[in-house]
């Protein structure tokens, strides 16, 4: 018999729906009292410890989720990804970000060709170039060393590398290697972002990395042209060849722009933007800042999880477990959001990156076969490091909406601080909150407990915590380059698991196209109105009104201005 077209039509899905009612009637206070249950919901791999015992689930729930995974052919879909099959069916592409961190002697094929040698050709080129920049053998147009780097890109070309950069900044080895150097990321087309990025930098000591696969991305190329003008106005047009390099596959446009094609670093159609941090997109700027050896450890960490994901049985497979639990929370328990709460300031850019990886991947309304989904899929992801988030949005998580939480802790701080006479050190203070918050969410506080504490009657409703709010805890031993790579890969594969089970294409992003095409029409109107005085036409009443107000308020903007760069 043919498999159902939608996962929700399978017996495994219906079985979980029937199972749901019993779970809803059981409070986490009761579930957490079952030591055997809790122990069965703890998994460890390579000193990464996952505790999902505070999920609204029992061992039977997990078994039923495994059956759902089987009904969705999860293992076969994972294998197809690793085998280079064109699982991105709407764009007819392989999905092979795992090849970006594979060892040199690996064989991972796309369209019958082993792509790993191509990957390592680029990695070797990055190592050579970054070494030359860092040791001063590659210098700028005026003979000065290039100590500062601005990486120009948007979306996946920005959020992933920024996450890794921020996480590495205070790692002892990485920070030592980065001494005297600066790495900045220019993403937004807003001129304020340009102004802030070039503020305090000297064009003579600055290298610009332009990241655009096609070299046609509107925002990125406008920012690249702006920085080209910043460099050439200070150093002359020939300086561009020494101060700008590219990550792109469009060599003719790279050369036309003024960048030496020998200084273009390739990546491939089988790398999606949000999965590209392990390609030249991230490896080049990160190697310029921290040295290739540090970045190679990051790649090795990601690869270790790639191996774990592809080979570990589901009951011990961290990304699979996380993905299945997300499906359970979203599609069955009806919780649309997820809070990513790292108790490490070094991970402050994790949530924004995973927000893109998750929401751009799984924010789909139809199946991979084009059928409308009759169930909720995708998650609204947000987060903030602890304990900052506790003084921000935790109020809602404790007493408002139920939002499943990922608590991420690190056993050993990158930068320990000890003060004589304090009850605990700074990291212990942080971790006290990491251990306390999941229990506060799970157990809550009852009116009876408050009465026993002699809380005033009129305050009891306000101080009651219902509890029964799910979370999971991930404990990392350290936060060095290797562990950062592992954490990245765990979340990447978790997102893939969700998409594989929901039966959607997690590797296209057609939702970003419509707004871009409409912006082209607006851009044409703004040009016509400023240069030729054309009236605003062809828009609905609301947009026409807004555009007219904008044009009237900016009537002093010259139609054909001379170049003006930020002055900050």
Swiss-Prot record:
A Gene Ontology molecular function term of the record: glucose-6-phosphate isomerase activity
One GO term (biological process): glycolytic process
Top class in the EC scheme: isomerase
Localization per Swiss-Prot or TrEMBL: Cytoplasm
Organism of this sequence: Clarkia mildrediae
Alphabetical list of Gene3D superfamilies matching this protein: 1.10.1390.10, Glucose-6-phosphate isomerase like protein, domain 1
Keywords, in A-Z order: Cytoplasm, Gluconeogenesis, Glycolysis, Isomerase
Cellular compartments per GO CC: cytosol
Entries under PROSITE patterns matching the protein: P_GLUCOSE_ISOMERASE_1, P_GLUCOSE_ISOMERASE_2, P_GLUCOSE_ISOMERASE_3
Quaternary structure and partners: Homodimer.
Listed name of the protein: Glucose-6-phosphate isomerase, cytosolic 1
Disulfide bond residue pairs: none
Known pathway: Carbohydrate degradation; glycolysis; D-glyceraldehyde 3-phosphate and glycerone phosphate from D-glucose: step 2/4
Enzyme Commission number: 5.3.1.9
Reactions that this protein is recorded to catalyse: alpha-D-glucose 6-phosphate = beta-D-fructose 6-phosphate
InterPro entries listed in its UniProt record: G6P_Isomerase, G6P_Isomerase_C, Phosphoglucose_isomerase_CS, SIS_dom_sf, SIS_PGI_1, SIS_PGI_2
Domain of life: Eukaryota
Active site feature: 360 (proton donor), 391, 516
Protein family (similarity comment): Belongs to the GPI family.
Gene that this polypeptide is encoded by: PGIC1
């Amino acid at each position: 018999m043919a498999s159902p077209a939608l996962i929700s039509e399978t017996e495994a899905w219906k079985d979980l729906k029937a199972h749901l009612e019993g779970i809803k009637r059981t409070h986490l206070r009761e579930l957490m009292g079952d030591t055997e249950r809790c122990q069965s919901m703890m998994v460890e791999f390579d000193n990464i410890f996952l505790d999902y015992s505070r999920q609204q689930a029992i061992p039977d729930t997990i078994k039923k989720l495994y059956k759902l995974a089987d009904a969705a052919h999860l293992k076969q879909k994972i294998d197809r990804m690793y085998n280079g099959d064109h699982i991105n069916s709407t764009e007819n592409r392989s999905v092979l970000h795992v090849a970006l961190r594979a060892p040199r002697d690996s064989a991972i094929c796309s369209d019958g060709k082993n792509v790993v040698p191509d990957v390592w050709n680029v990695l070797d080129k990055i190592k050579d170039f970054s070494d030359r920049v860092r040791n001063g053998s590659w210098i700028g147009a005026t003979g000065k060393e290039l100590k500062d780097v601005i990486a120009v890109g948007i979306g996946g070309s920005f959020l992933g590398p920024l996450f890794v950069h921020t996480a590495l900044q205070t790692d002892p080895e990485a920070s030592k290697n980065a001494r005297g150097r600066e790495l900045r990321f220019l993403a937004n087309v807003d001129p304020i972002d340009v102004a802030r990025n070039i503020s305090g930098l000297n064009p003579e000591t600055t290298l610009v990395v332009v990241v655009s696969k096609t070299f046609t991305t509107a925002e990125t190329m406008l920012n690249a042209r702006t920085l080209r003008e910043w460099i050439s106005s200070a150093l002359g047009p020939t300086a561009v060849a020494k101060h700008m390099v590219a990550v792109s596959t469009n060599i003719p446009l790279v050369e036309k722009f003024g960048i030496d094609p020998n200084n273009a670093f390739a990546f491939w159609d089988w790398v999606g933007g949000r999965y590209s941090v392990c390609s030249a997109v991230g490896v080049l700027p990160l190697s310029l800042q921290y040295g290739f050896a540090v970045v190679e450890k990051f790649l090795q960490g990601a690869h270790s999880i790639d191996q774990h994901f592809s080979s570990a049985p589901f009951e011990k497979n961290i990304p699979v477990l996380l993905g299945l639990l997300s499906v359970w929370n979203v599609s069955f328990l009806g919780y649309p959001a997820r809070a990513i709460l790292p108790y490490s300031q070094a991970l402050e850019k994790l949530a924004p990156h995973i927000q893109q990886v998750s929401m751009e991947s799984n924010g789909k309304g139809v199946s991979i076969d084009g059928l409308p989904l009759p169930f909720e899929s995708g998650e609204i992801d947000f987060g903030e490091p602890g304990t900052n988030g506790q003084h921000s949005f935790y109020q809602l998580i404790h007493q408002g909406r139920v939002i499943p939480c990922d608590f991420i802790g690190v056993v050993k701080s990158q930068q320990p601080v000890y003060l004589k006479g304090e009850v605990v050190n700074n990291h212990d203070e942080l971790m006290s909150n990491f251990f306390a918050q999941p229990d506060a969410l799970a157990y809550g506080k009852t009116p009876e407990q408050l009465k026993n504490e002699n809380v005033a009657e009129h305050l009891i409703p306000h101080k009651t915590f219902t509890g029964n709010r799910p979370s999971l805890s991930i404990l990392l031993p350290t936060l060095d380059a290797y562990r950062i790579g592992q954490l990245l890969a765990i979340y990447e594969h978790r997102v893939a698991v969700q998409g594989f089970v929901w039966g959607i294409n997690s590797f296209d992003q057609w939702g970003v196209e419509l707004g871009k095409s409409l912006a082209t029409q607006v851009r044409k109107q703004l040009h016509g109105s400023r240069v030729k005085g054309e009236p605003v036409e062809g828009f609905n009443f609301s947009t026409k009104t807004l555009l007219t107000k904008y044009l009237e308020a900016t009537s002093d903007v010259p139609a054909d201005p001379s170049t003006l760069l930020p002055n900050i």
